[in-house]
């Protein structure tokens, strides 16, 4: 994903009920005056306690039992009516028509909060549970193989060396090297099975080898309804660290076409310069505009030919210029805040969603991990969200 600062039986072609029926609603945040808190308190999926916020109708108690009860109480959010998504208003209606139907639950890096990130196990479990979209990143190896991995550099916190791919390999050890410096054979010698402090509950694995894009399509072949949201993991502020945007687009699209999944594939990027290259390759593939407060600003290297000042910071106007189908913002400013925080300011507000829908664009924020934020964003009217916890997202979507 989208994180700028994450033998299976054949699947039925029938979509889960929660996926067929998107929920619309009203975000709550007292400072914005858009809704009301009914109850307060919830534990985040990573086990950490949420910051206190909102109003509780319960009388304060000093007992441990009352404190525990308050922590498990739930925020609720009233519906907000937003404009319907007008596909025909999109700059490329045929591309907008290919977006997933219903609410788009996207498994970020194959659900890295539940399984080791970008792992085969996470991929298979995400498919089996019935997510609508697999969200993942692509790096290019030295020999041009599109590799399913988020980081430009092999991080010792995630991966460990096993043995060199060849005797006396001068590149060994591989940890600490750029992905683009190593061949896929060398990358395959890495064991990227480490649990991260931020995701302590991810199921441990003895062995996790990096996947290539073609393997994702092979593993997902029995799931004809699943979509793929593929990020070109480019670094416009350090172009020398990766392959070129054109090389990324060509390598990814070659695999997409070989697997015959173009009708279920979206291409996303923070590096907006890569998106027109995708459109040149495929006139009808959906494009996803990624941004957060660090990339969408005047003079940013991330926004390609878009002039921030000329559009007066209007993200929808910028998206129209690029001909995209999905707006995908970091879910809040500051990023990571939740409705329990006093300074929670969601980016995907009902106002932005309505404006985007009138322009023919869906809104799918990242990375939405706690239940409160999931409920608030569903109520605000988002068309989906990207999450490290797809099981949590699925459970919240069933609350009707």
Residue positions per predicted region:
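Phosphate-group recognition and catalysis centered on beta-loop-alpha active-site segments
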Residues: 2-8, 14-30, 42-60, 65-400
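Classical Sec-dependent N-terminal signal peptides that target proteins to the secretory pathway
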Residues: 33-35
């Amino acid at each position: 994903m989208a994180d700028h600062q994450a033998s299976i039986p054949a699947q039925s072609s029938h979509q889960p009920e929660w996926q067929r029926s998107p929920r619309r609603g009203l975000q709550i945040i007292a400072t914005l005056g858009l809704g009301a808190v009914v109850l307060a308190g919830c534990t985040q999926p990573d086990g950490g306690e949420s910051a206190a916020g909102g109003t509780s109708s319960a009388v304060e108690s000093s007992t441990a039992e009352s404190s525990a009860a308050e922590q498990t109480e739930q925020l609720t959010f009233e519906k907000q009516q937003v404009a319907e998504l007008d596909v025909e208003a999109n700059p490329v209606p045929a591309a907008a028509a290919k977006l997933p139907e219903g609410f788009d639950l996207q498994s970020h890096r194959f659900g890295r909060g539940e399984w080791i990130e970008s792992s085969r196990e996470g991929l298979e479990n995400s498919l089996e549970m019935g997510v609508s979209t697999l969200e993942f990143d692509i790096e290019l190896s030295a020999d041009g193989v599109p590799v399913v991995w988020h980081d430009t550099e092999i991080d010792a916190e995630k991966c460990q060396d096993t043995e060199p791919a060849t005797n006396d390999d001068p590149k060994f050890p591989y940890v600490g090297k750029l992905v683009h410096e190593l061949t896929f054979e060398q990358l395959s010698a890495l064991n990227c099975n480490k649990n991260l402090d931020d995701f302590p509950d991810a199921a441990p694995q003895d062995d996790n080898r990096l996947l290539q894009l073609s393997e994702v399509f092979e593993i997902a072949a029995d799931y004809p309804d699943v979509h793929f949201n593929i990020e070109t993991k480019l670094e416009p502020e350090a172009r020398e660290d990766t392959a070129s945007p054109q090389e990324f687009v060509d390598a990814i699209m070659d695999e997409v076409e070989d697997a015959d999944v173009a009708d279920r594939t979206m291409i996303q990027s923070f590096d907006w310069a890569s998106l027109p290259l995708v459109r040149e390759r495929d006139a009808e593939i959906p494009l996803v505009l990624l941004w957060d407060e660090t990339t969408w600003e005047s003079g940013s290297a991330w926004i390609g030919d878009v002039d921030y000042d000329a559009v007066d910071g209007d993200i929808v106007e910028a998206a129209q210029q690029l001909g995209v189908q999905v707006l995908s913002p970091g879910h809040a400013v500051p990023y990571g805040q939740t409705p329990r925080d006093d300074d929670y300011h969601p980016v995907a507000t009902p106002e932005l969603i309505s404006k985007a829908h009138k322009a023919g664009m869906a809104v799918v924020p990242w990375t939405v991990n706690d239940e409160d934020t999931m409920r608030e964003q569903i109520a605000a009217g988002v068309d989906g969200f990207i999450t490290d916890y797809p099981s949590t997202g699925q459970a919240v979507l069933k609350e009707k």
